Amino acid sequence: MPYVNIKVTDEGVTAEQKRQLIEGVTELLERVLNKPRYATSVVIDEVATDNWGVGGESVTTLRNKERNSGQR
């Protein structure tokens, strides 16, 4: 019984995008591992950017730097 946990920052992932992720991951496990759809669980966790760090800085800080420098 596969369990897949997808973590994304809480920056506006839509319900439709989540639906597509759940469907796509389920199809992938069915195709690659021959796992039945009914046995696959997919959980999407949205994490606040203050709670996600990359390279020693929070995503909030990184996004602010990107905005200030015109990147992204």
State where each predicted segment sits.
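A domain-level signal for the structural core that forms small-molecule/cofactor-binding pockets
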Residues: 2-72
